[in-house]
Amino acid sequence: MESPTQQQNLAEFSLAVRESSLKRFRSIPPGMENWRITPKSMSIADLAEHLIHTDRWLFRKLDDPTVQAISGNPGEVNIVMREQYDVLITQLFESGQRRAELFRNIKDEVLSKRIFDDHYGSGSESSVWWICVRANLDHEIHHRGALAVYLRVLKEINGAPIGAV
């Protein structure tokens, strides 16, 4: 049996990261989609939207290396009906599928290419592989950690079981 390629590993890891995020987003109780841990924090729905934006950013960045880093925007999303949140979570799932497909099909020479990287104050060049892993996948893991904290706080506030954290 052949060893998996770095592309297969990236795609598999990408799907695992997204599924873990989706598990947490799906456990949010109805009516809590706009909840935020502090008044200036991103809400739960804002976090989901931000992850969709970071996937779209990655696609643009690979097409145009001059694309600048983006940041999350508290208050960007306002969920009025649960169906809106369900659509948002479906979009998050779909962008995760597109991201995994991108990773599965990306060429070795593209992954090793060095492009402009303005993340984390570096303002220098990084490999495309590093941007995929650090600026996208690790970024999602960071926000999933925040979401896990949101869920724990909601559980404490409501005194009711809220999904697996």
Question: What spans do the regions from the language model cover?
Answer:
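Short, contiguous pre-domain boundary segments
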Residues: 1-6, 79-80
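Surface-exposed helix-capping loop/turn segments at secondary-structure junctions
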Residues: 27-34, 102-112, 152-159
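Short, contiguous alpha-helical
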Residues: 7, 11-15, 19-22, 32-76, ...
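Acidic/histidine-rich alpha-helical segments that form the ligand environment
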Residues: 24, 79-117, 126-142
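A very general structural signal that marks isolated residues within well-ordered alpha-helical segments
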Residues: 27, 53, 98, 105, ...
